[in-house]
Amino acid sequence: MKSLSFSFLVTLFLYLTLSSARTLGKDVNKRVTAGSLQQVTGFGDNASGTLMYIYVPKNLATNPGIVVAIHYCTGTAQAYYTGSPYAQLAEQYGFIVIYPQSPYSGTCWDVSSQAALTHNGGGDSNSIANMVTWTISQYNANTAKVFVTGSSSGAMMTNVMAATYPELFAAATVYSGVGAGCFYSSSNQADAWNSSCATGSVISTPAVWGGIAKNMYSGYSGSRPRMQIYHGSADTTLYPQNYYETCKQWAGVFGYNYDSPQSTLANTPDANYQTTNWGPNLQGIYATGVGHTVPIHGAKDMEWFGFSGSGSSSTTTASATKTSTTSTTSTKTTSSTSSTTTSSTGVAAHWGQCGGSGWTGPTVCESGYTCTYSNAWYSQCL
């Protein structure tokens, strides 16, 4: 009996040890080699075929933050990894960097299709969101320290991510982009080019722009990421008017009076840069004489994200704080918008919303006003 019991215990011990080793091996295999750019597959639903690359620093923090860094047209994850300061800053502050890569020819991002511009719609935005949730799960990341940034087409996608998945991000920085929904394709084309938007001809009010962003996640009432918007006055790819329209959009989302900012600071953060603050959640930075795109200000990003600031003992080298990226925006078929008609009961007041994807309120305006189509997400009584 004693011999049998001893044999049973030995067998049980070996079984549990091997089972534990197999489980540990699976967990380890899901993680990547620290200190180099690595591709990740199997991160979740990925209908658009977007590629995921990740940089895990050797100096990984406990419960690390995450920065999603999104490349420009013609760019790649590798190009943005080498051409931006985020991997260097990750070693300093211990956060993980996700570098998505566009699946399309020319590698612009899909910021035009209904799928991409809708929460859980299955486009590029959904794939990137799934990269974030995978990384949170694998590395026990701090969900209060997840951020998104990008340049040019990546800046457009940054605005889209902030609108479609506001629950995932605490803050965003946008380098030379356009507002969320500005590139919308009436033909539902993925990765479409919109010349009207690019040239700054799509002009609207904060209420309309804000409604467009909000309707990308209809019914959402939680917190939204703080937005920092950069643009250059000499941008001839995505014209400077897009700076004002993007700032209008987020002023509308946060309920700020766009025409009455709290402060305007000249020569901040650099000479010929003007910083405008509408409130704690929105800051615009307009760079006079700067083209496409505004150089990445890594140190300012770290302050905006909360990795550095007053009381921080860390210092950032100049080489890791401001980085110029070469971005090329390829021209594709221009898509125009067309009006839609819906029927419902009730009456919307002047300036009120009267239509849009996911809208369940009144679609008839009070006497004297017309329900005016802006895009698929927003119509307004004007």
From Swiss-Prot:
Inactivated by phenylmethylsulfonylfluorid (PMSF), a specific inhibitor of serine esterases. Residues 313-346 are annotated as: Disordered. It is found in: Secreted. GO terms for molecular function: acetylxylan esterase activity; cellulose binding. Glycans are attached at residues 46, 194. Residues 35-307 are annotated as: Catalytic. Residues 22-31 form a propeptide. NCBIfam families: esterase_phb. Belongs to the carbohydrate esterase 1 (CE1) family. AxeA subfamily. Monomer. This is Acetylxylan esterase A. It comes from Talaromyces purpureogenus (Soft rot fungus). The lineage of its organism: Eukaryota, Fungi, Dikarya, Ascomycota, Pezizomycotina. The gene is axeA.
